[in-house]
Amino acid sequence: MAPDPWFSTYDSTCQIAQEIAEKIQQRNQYERNGENTTKLTVTIRALLQKLKEKIALLKDLLLRAVATHQITQLEGDRRQNLLDDLVTRERLLLASFKNEGAEPDLIRSSLMTGGAKRGAPNPWLLEEPEETRGLGFDEIRQQQQKIIQEQDAGLDALSSIISRQKQMGQEIGNELDEQNEIIDDLANLVENTDEKLRTETRRVNLVDRKSTSCGMIMVILLLLVAIVVVAVWPTK
């Protein structure tokens, strides 16, 4: 699975924030020792600007991912929480850079080798979600990717179910078409049979009428013969 560009950008942004915290601590140490801090100050300013641009990029990527439904609303909310934490960290770093507030203890507590580890609280995450509390950046990313994979698997299963239902619907439709064709054939057969029956009935009636007429003619002929015979029969 290809790495998520949002989390790749998020990791690099966190690294920049970590580097800024280290540079600010180093600058403060130089100031206490009376050393020149001009070069460090320029570097910190450049890093702060880069951090600002990275956060803006993260916001843009998140908005596009949510708008195009590349991620779920729940995943969008989780990423927004991480982004809010970065914005808070940026403000604290900017305040520390300007020497506003008692930042040295805060910066020292943020300097953890290799980033945040499991079980080691991150002082920059003032309201860290319960799901990600005590997790490092890599672990958070893995957790988010696992959630996305589970959601993708659920969507694949749903798509498979819908495809099967669609196929069943098509099969039922084909079967109904076949049944309709059979019914149409039966209707045509019944109609043809009925027409034949009517034709044969007419023929039978015609034959019957002819037979009746022939019988009457025979009776008349017999009567005529009888009359003739009686007429010519000699009488005493």
Curated annotation (Swiss-Prot):
One of its GO terms (molecular function) is SNARE binding. InterPro entries: Syntaxin (IPR045242), Syntaxin-8_SNARE (IPR041875), T_SNARE_dom (IPR000727). This is Syntaxin-8. SUPFAM superfamilies: SNARE fusion complex. Belongs to the syntaxin family. The lineage of its organism: Eukaryota, Metazoa, Chordata, Craniata, Vertebrata. It is a single-pass type IV membrane protein. Ubiquitinated by HECTD3. The chain crosses the membrane at residues 216-232.
